[in-house]
Amino acid sequence: MAKTRGVLLPCWKRVIPLLAAMVLTGPACTQNPPSAAAPPPAPAPSESLATSVPLPTSPTGTATPTSGTPAAATPASDPAAVLTGIPGMDFSALSPAARRELATVMSDEFCYCGCPHTLGACLKGHTNCKHAKRMARLAARMVADGGPATEVIVTLSKYYASFREPRAQLKVDPRMCQGDPKAPVTVAEFSDFECPFCGKARPILEGFAKKNAGQVRFCYLPFPLSMHANAIPAGQAALWARDQGKFWEMHDALFEHQENLKPESLPALAKSLGLDGAKLAAVLKTDQYKQELEGFRAQGRSAAITGTPSVFFNGRFYDLGYEAEMLAHSLEDELEWRTNNNAWSAD
């Protein structure tokens, strides 16, 4: 069973504990389990993040080594043989159980660099392949958190395939973005102010964006869920404050008072920010901003999201979990992919 240390899980996974224990990562608050719809090569950040390219054959997952290629890594029944003798890599700190799972991953999964070799064979046969080392470190993090090999392999295959899939078309509001508008990577988050998982992800995502301010522009897209009674009025308050020039101040206040977002409590929040609480109270009695909120939700549905938080790197769905190390890893991958015109650099 996979542990979930440091990873935020969806509301439906909380409702179904067995599934929760078997899932490594995912969005958080959602009404229904995710469907099989695929998430939407890297566009330049702009108010419209859209692109579409042909989907080449992926070297990962079900690829089969061609004749004459090196044999796959030693069977995972002998973890010591699989994991030792890899230049520059030491997995001795992993538990015996984690080493067994990692050995299976290295024996069964193929390196994403494009070669026809398993990860283990690539690490030992192509010592200059930086991609194999990055993939191995990512897999090691996952098994260290308790991820079984079968789930790690699926997660890795989906993650690397996502770079070659068409990107989601996301329109962001610059007033609801932080960071350099010209940053090479726009990280867009669909979020619900009443979602507890969004509240937990918030400091991680914002800290990541601030740490990488020169490379990341962080944008917020409201995605109020019907399961949260106060999500719509909270969204109205945020958009109203945006029009007063204080979106992020209201954004922070809403999350800091997440346990009490009833409409009658929101005018006091506005007043604490130096805004006119009476005007907000009047807005909340109308349908003002509801159509705009529905527009954001339509964007999310078009991007095949099923819950919050849901994050995209330049329109590429991110599903490695809300940990600083995982976010940094995906940022490095996105920068390489973008720099090399939607391809991995040659080893």
What are these regions, as identified by a protein language model?
Residues D108-K124, F193-F197:
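Local cysteine-cluster metal-coordination motifs and their immediate loop/turn environment
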Residues P33, H131, T186-S191, F197-K210, ...:
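C-terminal cap of thioredoxin/glutaredoxin-like
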Residues G214-I232, H257, D287-K290:
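Thiol-based oxidoreductase modules, predominantly thioredoxin-like and allied folds used
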Residues A28-N32:
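Bacterial signal peptide processing site
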Residues L170-V185, K210:
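A short beta-strand-turn-helix
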Residues I16-G26:
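Bacterial N-terminal signal peptides
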Residues K3-I16:
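Bacterial N-terminal signal peptides that target proteins for export
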Residues P96-Y112:
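Immediate flanking context of iron-sulfur cluster ligation sites
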